[in-house]
Amino acid sequence: MPQKVRIALDAMGGDFGASVVIPGAAIALGRRPDTEFLLFGDSAKIAPQLDQHPRLKAVSRVIHTDVAVSNDDKPSQALRRGRKTSSMWLAIEAVKKGEADVAVSAGNTGALVAMARFCLRTLDGIDRPALAAIWPTTRGESVVLDLGATIGGDAHHLVALSVMGSALASVLFGKPKPTVGLLNIGVEEMKGHEEIREAAEQLRAMNLPQLDYIGFVEGDGIGKGAADVVVTEGFSGNIALKAAEGTARQVTEFLRGAIQASLMARIGYLFARGAFAALRARLDPRRSNGSVVLGLKGIVVKSHGGTDAEGFASAVRVGYEMARCDLLTKINQTLNRDGGASASEPVAQEAVS
């Protein structure tokens, strides 16, 4: 019998804290029974939720702390106030100590990235982490990064993101040489700012064995599945993510309004109910919730702060799968195949939320 995956949860993170984290963990456990949980947070708030889920309670250990990182805390403030004591820090530290295989938090993005970087440290050759997520496309799925861990970055940073993203895609999709594209305002070589053009030149010149660089990808190419990995710096990546989530919700509302507009539309819906249900599920952002903080000596997953239990369960699933497939080892192996791809670059600004 395989060893259980141990997941550390920041039970106080996100907009709703334990009232979403605990039910979400219970849903995840039902789908992945070979899981154990460390729950960090206020035991007085965790216990009532845990009592409603006996199966989860049986495989969980609560570690009390009444210190939680606020959504309004800047990364520097969170580090000063919550280092060593907050539920977010303690969940990350459990990974560092080997008590957990992965940490999951729905808390403040900037604080999470800062704490994870400070506690776990970056991998050799990686100057700063990135947020990567699995993005549903018309061709299947793609990996997109950086979705907001840091803002800005030079060509070296974009090349490092390409290497890490290709390693993640290789693990997830079983492709030894995934395709990689740089997000840009056009596919022509002269388009974009100097940093992205320089990164493109470096990727072409390096001809890395672990990835197939295909050139620039426009914004609509993400959803089309133009590349297995789409790379951008965190500011543009976060805008793309929020725009896609908003569009999915908008399309769902448009469909609901069209169906309710007339009797004939409602009758037609009855005949196509299965197709509409499949479309709604496909557009549901909760299914894609959970971004991996890549580039660290440990696995950390960021959940959306405003998600519900089902969405948080998706983030836990991402963490489970990253631990099960031994992502960290495979990223290290990929990075070691090219020591020069991840040269240091100037320090970036704080993460976006």
Curated annotation (Swiss-Prot):
Annotated compartments: Cytoplasm
Any one GO BP annotation for this protein: fatty acid biosynthetic process
Main location: cytoplasm
EC number: 2.3.1.274
Cystine residue pairs: none
Keyword Ubl conjugation: no
A GO-annotated cellular component: cytoplasm
Pfam families attached to this UniProt entry: FA_synthesis (PF02504)
Catalytic activity from the UniProt record: a fatty acyl-[ACP] + phosphate = an acyl phosphate + holo-[ACP]
Enzyme class, broadest EC rank: transferase
InterPro entries: FA_synthesis, Phospholipid_synth_PlsX-like
Record-level Gene Ontology MF annotations: phosphate:acyl-[acyl carrier protein] acyltransferase activity
Keyword Lipid biosynthesis appears in the UniProt entry: yes
Keywords assigned: Cytoplasm, Lipid biosynthesis, Lipid metabolism, Phospholipid biosynthesis, Phospholipid metabolism, Transferase
Pathway(s) of this molecule: Lipid metabolism; phospholipid metabolism
PANTHER family associated with the record: FATTY ACID/PHOSPHOLIPID SYNTHESIS PROTEIN PLSX (PTHR30100), PHOSPHATE ACYLTRANSFERASE (PTHR30100:SF1)
Its job: Catalyzes the reversible formation of acyl-phosphate (acyl-PO(4)) from acyl-[acyl-carrier-protein] (acyl-ACP). This enzyme utilizes acyl-ACP as fatty acyl donor, but not acyl-CoA.
HAMAP family in alphabetical order: PlsX
Self-association state and partner proteins as the record states: Homodimer. Probably interacts with PlsY.
NCBIfam families the UniProt entry points to: plsX (TIGR00182)
Family membership noted in the UniProt record: Belongs to the PlsX family.
Protein name per its UniProtKB record: Phosphate acyltransferase
Species name: Bradyrhizobium sp. (strain ORS 278)
